[in-house]
């Protein structure tokens, strides 16, 4: 039982994380690896995950927003940090102050960065985003973009660290569109080379491309979901990469009661007991990322058996029918996401029954759920965001 304030927690298996990184490194050979740890490392805790990545061959990190980069810097993470989203002009000073590597979406943006860097007598490394078919951010693949990027490369105190793009369908069986994207990417890069535009690195490979498109590795690959032990989709060939989920969501039973047949459970009286039932209450709910969309579909692992979640999931609590799983007591451990006793109900399973993807399931787990980092079977770190506690 976890004794730190709240009987709900995530267990983050750092040995599995190290295993996953090792498998990725074996796959990519001598290519450089940038660990994508945006969204608090997909819900696993960015700072602690970053430390393990850097100890195991990851040389750079990528996040989505400036705040995430600053959090890493404030926790003494010193390696290059790329921000994948566009940082608003109002915060360009922070890019300099924290030595962050931003995305440059236009010449005017780069020009402002250049002037700021010049005024501080600093050099700033930037990443040029290309829109090869995602339709999100980045330069279009056309002659005007070649000219504009060429102008950026000539700005004082600016160094182009990478030319990067992102696949939109690499996790699908049909790779035709991804191949088309890569063709566009190479075409624009070759045009830049002809104009003597210096690009330090090229990067386009995401998790799915790492698994199935080795010709796209270029200089630097960007694994995300596969580091955390989940495949990008059901369409990728899992035989291409062996990985292990690193997170288990657990709770302790906080209340047990017997309800008579005909009793209702939860908001809206959506569940009615059709027999005399033993109901256990767990102290987590949709505010913790355990979504109401699981109504009538979720199950947990307790006493070596599955037990169904019944009634609408509340903000902070949910109820489980444990009538058929033997004696259940307050304090008993329950697995809500993960594996135990040969049974499995993980983020992929939740994604399937709620019509989403494992990424969202992992990222939804709220910051008020404490994280226990485990190595060699022992807890080596506890992170509780709510009370800003490390132990």
Swiss-Prot record:
Substrate binds at residues 136, 315. InterPro entries: Ala_racemase, Ala_racemase/Decarboxylase_C, Ala_racemase_C, Ala_racemase_N, Ala_racemase_pyridoxalP-BS, PLP-binding_barrel. CDD domains: PLPDE_III_AR (cd00430). One of its GO terms (biological process) is D-alanine biosynthetic process. The keyword 4Fe-4S does not apply. GO terms for molecular function: alanine racemase activity; pyridoxal phosphate binding. Keywords: Isomerase, Pyridoxal phosphate. One of its GO terms (cellular component) is cytosol. Pathway: Amino-acid biosynthesis; D-alanine biosynthesis; D-alanine from L-alanine: step 1/1. The keyword Repressor does not apply. It comes from the Bacteria. Its EC number is 5.1.1.1. The modification N6-(pyridoxal phosphate)lysine is found at residue 38. It catalyses: L-alanine = D-alanine. Its cofactor is pyridoxal 5'-phosphate. The active site is at 38 (proton acceptor), 267 (proton acceptor). Catalyzes the interconversion of L-alanine and D-alanine. May also act on other amino acids. Belongs to the alanine racemase family. PANTHER family: ALANINE RACEMASE, ALANINE RACEMASE, CATABOLIC-RELATED. This is Alanine racemase.
């Amino acid at each position: 039982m976890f004794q730190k304030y709240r009987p709900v927690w995530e267990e983050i298996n750092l040995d599995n994380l190290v295993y996953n990184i090792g498998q990725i490194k074996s796959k990519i050979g001598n290519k450089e690896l940038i660990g994508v740890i945006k969204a608090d490392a997909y819900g696993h805790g960015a700072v602690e995950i970053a430390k393990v990545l850097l100890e195991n061959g990851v040389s750079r990190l990528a996040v989505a927003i400036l705040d995430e980069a600053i959090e890493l810097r404030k926790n003494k993470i010193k390696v290059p940090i790329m921000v994948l989203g566009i940082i608003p002009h109002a915060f360009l000073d922070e890019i300099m102050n924290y030595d962050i590597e931003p995305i440059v979406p236009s010449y005017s943006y780069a020009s402002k960065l250049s002037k700021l860097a010049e005024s501080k007598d600093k050099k700033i490394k930037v990443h040029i985003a290309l829109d090869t078919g995602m339709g999100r951010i980045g330069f279009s693949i056309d002659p005007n973009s070649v000219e504009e990027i060429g102008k950026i490369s000539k700005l004082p105190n600016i160094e182009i660290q990478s030319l990067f793009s992102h696949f939109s369908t690499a996790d699908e069986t049909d790779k035709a569109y991804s191949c088309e994207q890569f063709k566009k990417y190479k075409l624009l890069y070759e045009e830049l080379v002809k104009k003597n535009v210096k690009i330090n690195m090229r990067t386009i490979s995401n998790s799915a491309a790492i698994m199935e498109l080795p010709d796209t590795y270029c200089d630097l690959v960007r694994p995300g979901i596969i580091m955390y032990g989940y495949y990008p989709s059901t369409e990728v060939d899992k035989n291409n990469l062996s990985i292990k989920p690193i997170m288990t969501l657990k709770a302790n039973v906080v209340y047990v009661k017997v309800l008579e047949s005909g009793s209702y459970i939860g908001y809206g009286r959506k569940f009615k007991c059709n027999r005399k039932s033993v109901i256990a209450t767990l102290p987590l709910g949709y505010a913790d990322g355990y979504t109401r969309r699981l109504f009538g579909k979720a199950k947990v692992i307790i006493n070596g058996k599955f037990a169904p979640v019944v009634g609408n999931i509340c903000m902070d609590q949910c109820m489980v029918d444990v009538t058929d799983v033997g004696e259940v007591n307050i304090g008993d451990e329950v697995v809500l996401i993960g594996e135990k006793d040969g049974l499995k109900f993980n983020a992929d399973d939740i994604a399937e029954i709620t019509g989403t993807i494992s990424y969202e399931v992992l990222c939804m787990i709220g910051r008020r759920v404490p994280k226990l980092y485990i190595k060699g079977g022992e807890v080596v770190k506890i992170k509780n965001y709510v009370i800003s506690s490390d132990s």
